[in-house]
């Protein structure tokens, strides 16, 4: 099997795990920020043992790389917290659909970073995506849970777009496991104070679910995705990532009996169509 096909499989598997991970926001009754803390604790421990077993050097090449990876860890913590918050206040479908707008953010951020002009077509696609988001929102009152879910989901999508661009920059310098470890270890440090502020009570079932979320749906999936970026364009990875809400919504329907409304289905089709076209066009 050639390296590109292997990378495609890695990206597809990672996206499947990402999509299903959203269900943990409903399966766990803990606050979203505590779910993320548990997630990154288990995932960073798993990745550390993996790196030690593989005898990988985790020392970074330049001091400035530590600074950027700290930033990436902070962004990751914000991304996952808003992601689970979106799902907890609304539904898996709404949270995932709002988050899935991230490739549109990428099309705006990449030209800005590369100091290029934003194309008119990208602005049109952003408007179409926004219309899809509007369809998903049943009410424009900030007190509405679905509206809150969309807003949290959009923040999650925006921060994930930033993270994707930064990951692409450093995946050529370090192994996927090293990048994932630093990001998630930094997230642990950032989030640990919230444990003492909220003082959550854990049940055995919570710990088992957090371990599963941290090791399989975070450590392994995150590593697979970053590794796949070595031989796959960011735009191609974004196209594959469009399947994430599809996986999540299907599993939420079967396991949680969360059936999306007609508005959510229509809005989702508009969003995913715009996202798919924008990533195809940018190749």
Name what the model sees in each region.
Residues 1-37, 74, 82, 143-169:
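Glycine-/small-residue-enriched transmembrane alpha-helix faces in small-molecule transporters
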Residues 30-78, 103-106, 159-166, 181-198, ...:
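Transmembrane alpha-helices of multi-pass small-molecule transport proteins
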Residues 28, 35, 86, 98, ...:
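Hydrophobic/aromatic residues within transmembrane alpha-helices
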Residues 51, 102-127, 246-265:
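C-terminal transmembrane-helix exit sites in multi-pass transporters
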Residues 95-101, 167-187, 218-254:
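Helix-helix packing/entry segments at the starts of transmembrane helices
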Residues 47, 51, 70, 118-138, ...:
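Hydrophobic transmembrane alpha-helices of multi-pass small-molecule transport proteins
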Residues 19, 44-45, 130, 185-189, ...:
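Small-residue-rich packing faces within the transmembrane alpha-helices of Major Facilitator Superfamily
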Residues 48, 54-93, 99, 135, ...:
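Specific transmembrane alpha-helical segments of multi-pass solute transporters/efflux pumps
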């Amino acid at each position: 099997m050639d390296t590109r096909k292997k990378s495609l499989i890695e990206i597809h598997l990672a996206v499947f795990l990402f999509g299903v991970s959203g269900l943990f926001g409903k399966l766990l009754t803990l606050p979203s920020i505590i779910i993320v803390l548990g997630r990154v604790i288990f995932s960073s421990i798993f990745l550390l043992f993996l790196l030690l077993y593989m005898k990988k050097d985790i020392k970074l090449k330049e001091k400035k790389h530590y600074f950027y990876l700290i930033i990436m860890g902070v962004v990751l913590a914000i991304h996952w917290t808003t992601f689970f918050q979106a799902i907890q206040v609304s539904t898996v479908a709404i949270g995932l659909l709002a988050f899935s707008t991230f490739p549109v953010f990428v099309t705006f951020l990449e030209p800005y970073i590369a100091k290029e002009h934003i194309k008119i077509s990208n602005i049109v696609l952003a408007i179409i995506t926004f219309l899809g988001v509007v369809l998903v929102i049943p009410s424009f009152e900030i007190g509405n849970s679905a509206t809150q879910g969309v807003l949290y989901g959009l923040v999650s999508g925006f921060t994930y777009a930033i993270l994707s661009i930064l990951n692409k920059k450093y995946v050529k310098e370090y192994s996927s496991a090293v990048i994932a470890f630093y990001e998630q270890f930094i997230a642990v440090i950032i989030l640990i104070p919230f444990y003492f502020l909220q003082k959550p009570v854990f049940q055995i079932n919570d710990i088992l679910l957090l371990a599963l979320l941290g090791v399989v749906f975070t450590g392994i999936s995150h590593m697979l995705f970053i590794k796949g970026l070595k031989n796959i364009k960011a735009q191609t990875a974004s196209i594959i990532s469009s399947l994430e809400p599809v996986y999540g919504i299907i599993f939420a329907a079967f396991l949680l009996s969360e059936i999306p409304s007609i508005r959510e289905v229509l809005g989702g089709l508009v969003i995913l169509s715009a996202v798919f076209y924008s990533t195809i066009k940018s190749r």
